[in-house]
């Protein structure tokens, strides 16, 4: 296909992309990974007598057997009086929780380096990704079968890509957030990491997590709404369905072919697209024009919500008051927050508070909400399936079925798109998970906040729209030190199309694993 008159090279011949071999990337010398905050087995009332698989829990998800610190000094000694719903649900399905994992403080970061417990390193000695870096490393190192993380703007998918594992973010409202320490309520989503897509599918679909409404979580979709959403979808009634590639169409978003995209990542993207074509799937270009503004909107909305959520950490309800709090003229919470929060959290609180101020609300927060609606509209326009939570009628913004995508008439005649001036309708969207491979830990520590934010450019749009997305690992060429590096390939589905998305991921991962490409 072409981008601005130049061929991207996605329509290749035979490809050589393959799923990573998890033993090949481990360094010869042991690296201090620092991925667990608390480790140890403890029984729970919800735990069955015979546990069947091991789970690590991100340290911003409440457990009673381990402290819940959110990698912050302000919660250093905090232990939750109750257990998160999703942890209890996994225990009842045979999980044994072996510990809690390190993260960026309160989930705010890209490399799991903003932690009161110190930075996390991947088994390859590189950035573990963030903010669920500890969970991804626990899976990559083979210490657990499944790990829980949270995904606000890519915090499950990015670590999965950096560590060569599978990372799944379900549709917003599917898995309960009760017991999850909030960063941004309208974006936070509990996600799963594992080496096997099948394991994730078994839990979400086979074990029925998708159907579990939680009265304690106001963002949990009601039981009636779940059934209504599932009624227009396939894959929720039984075992994984056999995927018929010939009937599927994958969209390649033109706007994702950015200048900053690493050539090795682009090559992996091209090869997976070519592989899908060789299997019989249709691969076409699509336009998601508002995704260019998605990252900026996210970094207005998420900090704004965070500034409100973190207001409770005042040294009275949470945290320890500092000595200055005893002064009559002092501010009670100033010392507690100053000593308890790290630099990145303080930065985002200030940014969020400003965007909610009277002088900035209209220019920043309100505009960011408009961009968010446009991003969702872009996805709804290109997906074959309708969004069950959205009115299908056209709106003033032009989201409806009659809306047209950007003019693609200059694309090469060989590109299989029937109407290059109308909306291309696809089953799934295929993109890289991250624009670059995992940087070294030193490179990650030296990145500015702006540099780190750009790593989320491909993951944020699905988060803003509340869509399910999965990151699958593929091998890239070895670096100069002979250490294997991974590319994450992301597949995005329409809202509540999680079961079919997981079926496709299982099938694609199986082909990659067999090397039949």
From Swiss-Prot:
Q: What's any GO biological process attached to this entry?
A: glutaminyl-tRNAGln biosynthesis via transamidation
UniProt entry keywords in alphabetical sequence: ATP-binding, Ligase, Mitochondrion, Nucleotide-binding, Protein biosynthesis
* Pfam families linked: Amidase
Provide a Gene Ontology MF annotation, just one.
glutaminyl-tRNA synthase (glutamine-hydrolyzing) activity
- The active site consists of 58 (charge relay system), 131 (charge relay system), 155 (acyl-ester intermediate)
Q: What is its EC number?
A: 6.3.5.7
PROSITE patterns, sorted: AMIDASES
Predominantly, its location class is: mitochondrion
The answer, when asked if Oxidoreductase is one of the entry's keywords, is no
Q: What class of enzyme is it?
A: ligase
InterPro entries noted in UniProt? Amidase, Amidase_CS, Amidase_dom, AS_sf, GatA
Q: From the Swiss-Prot or TrEMBL record, state where the protein is found.
A: Mitochondrion
Q: Where is this region: Disordered?
A: 106-132
Q: Which reaction does it catalyse?
A: L-glutamyl-tRNA(Gln) + L-glutamine + ATP + H2O = L-glutaminyl-tRNA(Gln) + L-glutamate + ADP + phosphate + H(+)
Q: Which GO terms describe its cellular component?
A: glutamyl-tRNA(Gln) amidotransferase complex; mitochondrion
Q: What does this protein do?
A: Allows the formation of correctly charged Gln-tRNA(Gln) through the transamidation of misacylated Glu-tRNA(Gln) in the mitochondria. The reaction takes place in the presence of glutamine and ATP through an activated gamma-phospho-Glu-tRNA(Gln).
- What do we know about how this protein assembles, alone or with others? Subunit of the heterotrimeric GatCAB amidotransferase (AdT) complex, composed of A, B and C subunits.
State the family named in the UniProt similarity comment for this chain.
Belongs to the amidase family. GatA subfamily.
Q: What is this protein called?
A: Glutamyl-tRNA(Gln) amidotransferase subunit A, mitochondrial
Source species, please?
A: Pyricularia oryzae (strain 70-15 / ATCC MYA-4617 / FGSC 8958) (Rice blast fungus)
């Amino acid at each position: 296909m072409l981008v601005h008159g130049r061929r991207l090279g996605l329509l290749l011949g035979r490809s050589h992309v393959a799923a990573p071999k998890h033993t090949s990337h481990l360094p010869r010398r042991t690296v201090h990974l620092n991925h667990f905050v608390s480790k140890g087995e403890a029984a729970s009332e919800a735990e069955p007598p015979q546990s069947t698989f091991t789970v690590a829990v991100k340290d911003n998800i409440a457990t009673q057997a381990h402290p819940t610190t959110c990698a912050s000094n302000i919660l250093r000694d905090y232990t939750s009086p109750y257990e998160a719903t999703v942890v209890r649900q996994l225990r009842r399905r045979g999980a044994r929780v072996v510990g809690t994992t390190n993260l960026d403080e309160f989930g705010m970061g890209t490399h799991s380096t903003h932690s009161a417990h110190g930075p996390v390193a991947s088994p390859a000695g590189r950035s573990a990704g963030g903010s669920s870096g500890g969970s991804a490393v626990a899976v990559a190192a083979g210490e657990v079968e499944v790990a829980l993380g949270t995904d606000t703007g890519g915090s499950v998918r990015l670590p999965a890509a950096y560590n060569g594992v599978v990372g799944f973010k379900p549709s917003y409202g599917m898995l309960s957030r009760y017991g999850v320490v909030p960063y941004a309520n309208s974006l936070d989503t509990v996600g799963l990491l594992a080496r096997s897509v099948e394991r994730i599918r078994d839990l979400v679909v086979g074990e029925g997590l998708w159907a579990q409404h939680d009265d304690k979580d106001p963002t949990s979709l009601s039981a009636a709404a779940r059934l209504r959403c599932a009624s227009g979808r396939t894959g929720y009634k039984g075992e994984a369905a056999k995927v018929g590639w010939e009937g599927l169409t994958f969209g390649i978003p033109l706007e994702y072919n950015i200048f900053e995209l690493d050539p090795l990542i682009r090559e992996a993207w091209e090869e997976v697209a070519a592989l899908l074509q060789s299997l019989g799937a249709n691969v076409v270009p699509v336009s998601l024009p508002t995704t260019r503004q998605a990252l900026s909107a996210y970094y207005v909305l998420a900090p704004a919500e965070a500034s409100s959520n973190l207001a409770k950490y005042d040294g009275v309800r949470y945290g320890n008051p500092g000595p200055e709090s005893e002064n009559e003229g002092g501010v009670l919470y100033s010392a507690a927050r100053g000593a308890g929060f790290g630099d990145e959290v303080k930065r985002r609180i200030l940014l969020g508070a400003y965007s909610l101020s009277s002088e900035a609300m209209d220019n920043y927060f309100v505009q960011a909400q408009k961009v968010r609606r446009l991003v969702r509209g872009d996805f709804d326009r290109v997906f074959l399936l309708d969004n069950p939570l959205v009115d299908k009628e056209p709106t003033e913004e032009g989201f409806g079925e009659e809306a047209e995508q950007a003019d693609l008439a200059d694309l090469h005649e060989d590109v299989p798109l029937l109407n290059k001036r109308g909306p291309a309708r696809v089953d799934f969207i295929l993109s890289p998970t991250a624009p670059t491979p995992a940087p070294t830990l030193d490179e990650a520590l030296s990145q500015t906040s702006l540099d780190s934010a750009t790593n989320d450019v491909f993951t944020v749009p699905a988060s803003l729209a509340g869509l399910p997305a999965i990151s699958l690992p593929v091998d890239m060429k070895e670096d100069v030190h002979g250490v294997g590096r991974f590319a994450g390939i992301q597949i995005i589905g329409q809202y509540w199309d999680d079961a079919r998305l997981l079926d496709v991921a299982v099938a694609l991962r199986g082909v990659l694993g067999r090397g039949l490409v």
